[in-house]
Regions:
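Extracellular Ig-like/FN3 beta-sandwich strand-entry sites
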Residues: 86, 145-147, 274-276
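Secretory/extracellular carbohydrate-interaction modules
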Residues: 69-128
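Beta-strand-rich ligand- or partner-binding modules
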Residues: 1-61, 68-72, 78-83, 169, ...
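Short, aromatic/His-centered strand-loop micro-motif at the edge of beta-sheets
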Residues: 128-149
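Short tryptophan-centered beta-strand motifs in secreted/extracellular beta-sheet-rich domains
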Residues: 43, 89-93, 145-161
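Short, exposed beta-strand/loop patches in secreted or surface proteins that constitute
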Residues: 23-26, 60-66, 113-120, 152, ...
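Short, solvent-exposed beta-strand-to-loop segments that form ligand-recognition rims
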Residues: 163-180
Length: 304
């Protein structure tokens, strides 16, 4: 007998066929499964996500979902809900370089408080924080007119700004109270700010992803289960599998299906038989700002 990679999940479409319980199919993870964040927006539909609104700066200002992104021109667009401190906001965005383009957290961006990546009044990007006093750090013009992954850690005593995974500045500006995620462009027609996706912590401390049922086409002897995952410190991914005769197991302990069996580690042996197989991934984190990312699962069975 020879082990072969037979069935599994490795793409967004694959994972979309499963069932989420406090987990999330994330663009941040290139289509992988993460713990559910407190707020997420993919901007992949035809309209704004539920709970988002537009506030034009002037007549003709717009914010619309176009080609898989939020595109803002002469307006502000943000959540209707406000959130307290102790959060991280991460987003993929592109600034055209026109003055007064901002993405970050604030109440309305007309008055403090705010924490934002901003073009300010020159063709350069800044990290800007403001509560009782403003503070800004010039990041230069190289970050304009191209997509980058931005992160703002809104801590109790400081604000940490990160671009493409590297911390660019820490500002000692304590900000208390409530703010909301906002994307803003200050003038109609002089350039747009584009946000592809947005995510805000805290992540759920635990969650479960249950895969669709895989069909081997006949009774087989299952050999092993392997997975690929990013597991930051304080997080974990665990897998369990079950096999059965029917294509649609019911809840609980369905007839004709084995109990869930934990897989000791990626690539470990699965001593079970049956035509159908299903896996369940348990994701956990004891750090609210971190999540593991499940990127691929492969189930192997014996063939003659």
């Amino acid at each position: 007998m020879t082990d072969v990679v037979s069935l599994g999940d490795s793409s967004p479409d694959d994972f979309a066929a499963g069932r989420h319980d406090q987990t999330y199919l994330s663009a941040l993870a290139d289509g992988g499964v993460t713990l559910a964040p407190a707020l997420a927006a993919e901007f992949s539909g035809s309209g704004l996500p539920a709970g988002w609104s537009v506030w034009p700066w002037a007549a003709g200002g717009t914010a619309e979902v176009r080609d898989g992104a939020l595109v803002v021109d002469g307006a502000r667009c943000g959540t209707e809900a406000m959130f307290p401190s102790g959060r991280s906001l991460e987003f993929m965005a592109s600034f055209s370089g026109a003055a007064d383009q901002h993405v970050g957290l604030g109440t309305d961006f007309a008055s403090a408080p705010w924490v934002m990546f901003s073009t300010g009044h020159a063709r350069s990007l800044y990290a800007r924080s403001n509560f009782y006093r403003p503070e800004e750090t010039r990041l230069g013009g190289d970050l304009l007119e191209s997509r980058h992954r931005f992160r703002i850690d809104w801590n109790v005593l400081d604000i940490i700004y990160t671009v493409d995974g590297a911390v660019v500045v820490k500002q000692m500006v304590p900000i208390v109270g409530f703010m909301r995620p906002i994307a803003s462009d200050g003038r109609v027609g002089d350039g747009e700010v584009t946000v592809e996706w947005l995510r805000m912590t805290p992540y759920s401390p635990s969650g479960t992803f249950t895969s669709r049922v895989f069909d081997a086409g006949r009774d087989v002897r299952w050999a092993s289960a392997g997975w690929q995952a990013a597991v930051p410190a304080g997080t974990a991914v665990r897998l369990r599998v079950r096999t059965g005769d029917s294509p649609a197991p019911g809840p609980g302990a369905p007839e004709g299906w084995s109990p869930w069996t934990a897989v000791a580690s990626s690539g470990a042996r699965v001593d079970a038989s049956g035509r159908h197989v299903q896996y369940q991934a348990e994701l956990t984190s004891n750090v609210p700002a971190r999540t593991p990312v499940l990127r691929e699962v492969a189930l192997r069975h014996h063939v003659d």
